[in-house]
Amino acid sequence: MGRVEGKVAIVTGGGSAGMGRVTSLLLASEGAKVVVGDIHEAGAKETAEQIIATGGQAVALRHDVASEEGWAEIIQLALDTYGRLDILDNNAAMFIAKPLMETSTTEFRRQNQVNVDGVFFGMKAAIPAMELTGGGAIVNISSGAGIVGFAAAGAYSSSKGAVRLMTKSMALECAQRQNNIRVNSIHPGPILTPMLEQGMDDLGGGDEVRGMFEGMAPMGHLGEALDIANGVLYLASEESKYVTGAELAIDGGFIAQ
């Protein structure tokens, strides 16, 4: 029996070839039915097709996490298709590698719309659905840069810091409501994903920039999307039934420095 057998999960940003897709596939391989959301519908459909091809169950939807209406739609899709919602992986994010002094107001606000508003809207929409069937687990993907500052991407860092404390606040709120919903955050370090590759390109690319990111982790190399997916699986499963309001750093030692 899988570690999340029979549970229904929503994964945002699930159409990317990074953490979202890998997490969706891992949850499905452990028995979850997965609703894959992504701003790029083709990517979401590709992830769902990969799950179905391996014998799992999945549906896909074009989903803008910065839209409250979009959240109502994806929650309803989960309920209409599978009858319940047990897991929410708030994975979708925007990363612009610029110092704050070089960041435009539009860039700052857009990152907050995706990274902060998206998590806020998602939790508010998912919790009532989870309460219908006795609880659930929310995993918010923050960042190591949400715990310490990051001069090369200040707006991203501040947005992920907001996710960190919003997670703790909602965990306490759910505990007070006694609704059996756990809320935790994961803090990746430098993980080799398309989003990080784009960020490295924004900073000029090349071996020097890659070396800068590799050097952030005392372990001396970039992490993999599966490292994060394994953390999501743990926090979504009953193995973590006494864990809420926690921050799980999967970062090669980045924040230990």
Each language-model region and where it sits:
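Substrate-binding pocket helix/loop in short-chain dehydrogenase/reductase
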Residues: P99-L100, E107-R109, I138, D201, ...
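Alpha-helical segment proximal to the catalytic Tyr-Lys
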Residues: P128, L172-Q176, K241
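Short C-terminal tail/terminal secondary-structure segment
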Residues: G18, V148, T193, G215, ...
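Residue(s) in the substrate-gating loop at a strand-loop-helix junction
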Residues: S143
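Canonical Rossmann dinucleotide-binding motif of NAD(H)/NADP(H)-dependent dehydrogenases/reductases
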Residues: G2-V35
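Short, small/polar-rich loop/turn modules that mediate ligand/substrate recognition or access, typified
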Residues: A175, N180-R182, V243-G245
